[in-house]
Amino acid sequence: FVGDVFGAPLAAEGVLAFFLESTFLGILLFGRHRVSSRVRVAAAFIVAFGATFSGFWIVVANSWMQTPAGYEIQGDKAVLTDFLAAVFNPSTMPRYVHTIAASLAAAAFLMTGISAWYVRKGRSLDVAARGVRLGLIVAVVASGLMFLTGDFSAKQVAETQPEKFAAMQ
């Protein structure tokens, strides 16, 4: 019924983000003795960008299911009428920023934990101590952003889906 609309963000994720990630992940993993360290660092950043971009399209698809926009019913199926309205529906950006903040917080806590383990074992103390400090700073900032965007998302749900908001309470 909604394949023409719902398929668009999934196709964008597959074509744009997934291939970007997989190509540069291959360079990152298998290019150690084949490409320079600068190329490998660039590949790592491109993989991170690709994963973030992939997450955007996945959130777009989920957000469209929650607050559909940019389509109309024609006969027995939904037809995409405004791609940008479907992509940037009322819940896309709050959900996406919340997801990115949560991902950063999780990664920062992981980095902090691994760095703290190195400090405890007395290995690579210089790098490990910087890892603990940076990890904690990013974790605190990302967690604060996560709380703010979570509140904003809840207000958006209350506005666009009052029944769902009532069930959340």
Predicted regions and their residues:
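Polytopic transmembrane helical bundles with strong interfacial aromatic enrichment
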Residues: F1-Q169
